[in-house]
């Protein structure tokens, strides 16, 4: 029998963003979207401002969408999640705990300096020391420069996911010189080796980038990319309709329904690795009892949440990671069984149930999800 995962409720969300016709849905939107429209500026709106443009300082979506235009990594992932060469042109594994990367020659940072192995060593060691992203590189215990274009990375034990982890958007390769000179201000004036270089950041409003003519994969076809911070979803939708915006992210509810049949736009929708879930403190009673947690899992039906709150833009999950993530195991999902849930609660010492609180923030999606969960949990 397949082992069931003990998380209460998880939903794999769909990535949603809309582009005006002629754009592209590649993950480097700025490098491709709008290339066939004749425009020299692409305006992208998302629902929150970036936290930092320093890739080692935060791991949030609004920041990452901008930073992926500014920086490159040693590795990239293709559409199937398979590691592909990026700044590392090739690699070899002399043993199970060592990987040697051979770097591309002639890669320029936005300050004009050539990328060298010393920059890679500096960047990986900086990420390892950063509280926000160090967990991504857990297991790496050494980075050594062999020559200007060769780096050796060693791990404490065999690490199957190391190439995938080095492709993470936060594990960007920085210019040691530019980063050191900028100090704490690097996140507001970043220097990378990506297709776009930083121009300005009007906090709370917009980040402006321009194409880097010396990019190692060739200059991007759209000269300028502007990331707008537009908190209200309706205002993002209106901006797309009026032509003020070319791409909008974070689309939910009626706006999705309204726009997806409009032939002027392309809705790009696909599975994300993020989850919406109900969590609890397993060190405190009654949630320290596995039978209580399992009872709650059996009490929940994810379908009404997906259909009502997410308007179908999601699917029930059986794990805290999605099927497009390395290491995913296709284990059996929980399905709602009220009688079984009641029996488990009784076995745990709560034949009449117990009172509980669901804490949520002001996000309407989470609030609406909590209301449905409240109704379902009342049944046990």
Please give the residue ranges for each predicted region.
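Surface-exposed binding/hinge segments that line
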Residues: 92, 96, 135-178
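N-terminal lobe/hinge region of extracytoplasmic solute-binding protein
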Residues: 45-94, 125, 191
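Gly/Pro-rich hinge or "lid" segments in bacterial periplasmic/extracellular proteins
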Residues: 82, 167-219, 224, 339
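Ligand-site clamp/hinge motif
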Residues: 212-257
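Aromatic- and charge-enriched surface segment that lines or borders ligand/interaction sites
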Residues: 89-130, 146, 152
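Append "and occasionally in soluble cytosolic enzymes with long acidic Gly/Pro-rich linkers
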Residues: 288-375, 379-380
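A structural "hinge/loop" feature
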Residues: 48-64, 87, 113, 157, ...
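A bilobed periplasmic-binding-protein/Venus flytrap-type ligand-binding module shared by bacterial periplasmic
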Residues: 210-213, 272-295, 299
């Amino acid at each position: 029998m397949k082992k069931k995962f003990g998380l209460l409720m998880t939903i794999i969300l769909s990535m949603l963003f809309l582009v005006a016709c002629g754009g592209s849905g590649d993950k480097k939107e700025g490098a491709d979207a709008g290339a066939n429209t004749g425009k020299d500026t692409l305006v992208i709106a998302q629902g929150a401002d970036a936290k930092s443009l320093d890739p080692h300082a935060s791991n949030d979506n609004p920041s990452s969408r901008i930073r992926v235009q500014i920086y490159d990594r040693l590795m990239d992932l293709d559409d199937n999640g398979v590691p592909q060469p990026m700044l590392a042109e090739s690699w070899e594994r002399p043993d199970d705990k060592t990987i040697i990367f051979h770097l591309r020659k002639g890669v320029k940072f936005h300050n004009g300096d050539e990328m060298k192995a010393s920059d890679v060593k500096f960047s990986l060691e900086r990420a390892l020391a950063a509280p926000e992203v160090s967990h991504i590189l857990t297991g790496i215990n050494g980075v050594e420069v062999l020559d200007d274009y060769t780096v050796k990375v060693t791990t404490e034990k065999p690490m199957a996911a190391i190439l995938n982890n080095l492709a993470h958007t936060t594990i960007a390769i920085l210019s040691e010189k530019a980063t050191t000179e900028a100090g704490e201000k690097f996140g507001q004036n970043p220097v990378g080796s990506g297709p776009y270089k930083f121009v300005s950041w009007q906090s709370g409003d917009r980040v402006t980038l321009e194409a880097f003519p010396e990019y190692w994969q060739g200059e991007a076809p759209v000269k300028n990319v502007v990331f707008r911070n537009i908190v209200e979803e309706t205002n993002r939708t209106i901006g797309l309709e009026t032509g003020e915006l070319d791409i909008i992210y974070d689309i939910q509810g009626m706006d999705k329904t309204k726009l997806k049949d409009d032939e002027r736009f392309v809705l790009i929708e696909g599975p994300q690795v993020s989850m919406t879930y109900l969590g609890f403190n397993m060190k405190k009673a009654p949630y320290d009892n596995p039978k209580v947690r399992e009872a709650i899992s059996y009490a929940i039906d994810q379908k009404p949440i997906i259909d009502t709150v997410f308007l179908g833009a999601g699917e029930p999950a059986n794990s805290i990671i999605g099927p497009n993530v390395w290491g995913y195991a296709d284990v059996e999902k929980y399905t709602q069984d009220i009688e079984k849930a009641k029996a488990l609660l009784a076995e745990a010492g709560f034949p009449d149930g117990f009172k509980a609180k669901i804490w949520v923030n002001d996000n309407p999606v989470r609030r609406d999800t909590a209301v449905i969960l409240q109704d379902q949990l009342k049944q046990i």
